[in-house]
A protein has these predicted regions:
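Membrane-interfacial, low-structure loops and terminal tails that flank and connect transmembrane helices
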Residues: 2-18, 77-100, 348-357
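Membrane-interfacial catalytic/cofactor-binding modules of polytopic membrane enzymes
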Residues: 215-295
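Membrane-interfacial alpha-helical segments at the cytosolic side of multi-pass membrane proteins
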Residues: 179-184, 283-301, 331-340
């Protein structure tokens, strides 16, 4: 019987079919993102191109850098006689049509989708007001015995230095989560898992970050009195964060919240701009890693799930989100992940463990 990493005709055929499905899926998702923007926004094409000229080169450089690191690492292991399982085929995969086809299509789809999302979030979501904050406040209080969840997190994590740690985990340390898509592009094994991750990543931006966010438009607690409400509901949280920012800051959250509000008030479109609370894309990206982690090994699954839970708690603690923003995000992501996984063979049948040419 062929070993798990042996390149057999059946595995080569399965990988080729998955690659074709993946390319069709990501091109379709990017097309939907662009269509939504063109149909619902008056911004036109210029801001999309401007944002894309920032995202595109950065994404490409990071991908090529990680690709170079991977190629050098495999070559070094071969030179040292420490051949890794399945790595002998990697240089051949590096020069294959499937590999480069996936890479180029994926980078283009990512650039188009994220650029469309950015402009959509800045020009469509909230353009007719943030309508559902009051509803989500009520949902949160129904789940937490009449209290706002931030009251509980700040009662337990009362130190400003606890808030500082959460702020670090929520913002600067979140970069690897955002780069998960590019890591999957240059990785070697488990194509079914990688295709599921990347498809879910892009679909999450469109289905959750664009369609659902516009249908359920809300600004989040920190913007009480500015973008919704009369400023009384969350003023204690806003004052507390301002005080802690003075004593233990500066917090990235406070800077980012002020920055996004300034962009919103001036009608500017910038990378990372736009205000939207429900559902939380921050939590979507965190739980994408958690879902993937469980398919790699139990320890990683537990570790990344704990981190994702911290992100969820942190989103409430820092005033970005209502608790239910995360709940809806995780439930929607689970459906997207499972649908993509079924399509690529992650569930229901044995997946191809190693990529082939």
């Amino acid at each position: 019987m062929a070993s798990e990493t042996t390149i057999t005709p059946a595995k080569a055929d399965a990988h080729s079919r998955n690659s074709a499905r993946f390319r069709i899926a990501v091109v379709g998702i990017a097309s939907v993102a662009s269509a939504l923007l063109m149909l619902q926004s008056d911004a036109g094409l210029a801001p999309v191109l401007e944002v894309a000229t920032g995202y595109g080169p950065a994404i490409t450089v990071i991908a090529l850098f990680l690709l170079l690191v991977r190629f050098i690492w495999v070559g070094f292991r071969h030179i040292c006689g420490q051949q890794m399982d399945g790595s002998a085929a990697w240089p051949r995969v590096f020069f294959s049509r499937i590999f480069w086809g996936d890479l180029l299509v994926s980078l283009a789809a990512l650039t188009v989708t994220v650029s469309s999302f950015t402009v959509y979030k800045s020009t469509v979501i909230g353009s007719d007001g943030y309508r559902f904050d009051a509803l989500f406040i009520a949902w949160d209080r129904a789940l937490f015995a009449g209290k706002d969840p931030w009251v509980l997190t700040h009662a337990i994590l009362s130190s400003p230095y606890a808030t500082k740690v959460i702020d670090i985990l929520y913002h600067p340390a979140f970069l690897p989560m955002v780069l998960g898509y590019i890591v999957c592009l240059v990785a070697r094994g488990r194509p079914a898992l990688r295709y599921t991750y990347m498809t879910s990543y892009l679909a999450g931006f469109v289905i959750i970050g664009m369609i659902a966010a516009n249908a359920l438009s809300s600004a989040g607690p920190i913007y009480d009195g500015v973008l919704f409400g009369d400023g009384t509901t969350f003023q204690p949280l806003i004052d507390r964060l301002a005080s802690q920012n003075t004593s233990a800051g500066p917090f990235s959250a406070v800077f980012a919240q002020d920055y996004l509000l300034a962009l919103n008030e001036r009608g500017l479109i910038r990378r990372g701009g736009g205000i939207s609370a429900m559902p939380s894309m921050h939590i979507v990206l965190a739980f994408l890693w958690a879902f993937a982690g469980w398919h790699l090994n139990r320890f990683l699954g537990v570790a990344v799930t704990i981190y994702a839970a911290i992100i969820w708690i942190g989103s409430v603690h820092l005033g970005w989100h209502y608790f239910v923003d995360g709940l809806v995000a995780v439930l929607m992501l689970a459906v997207i992940w499972y649908a993509a996984g079924r399509s690529f063979g992650l569930y229901g049948r044995a997946q191809v463990i190693r990529a082939t040419t």
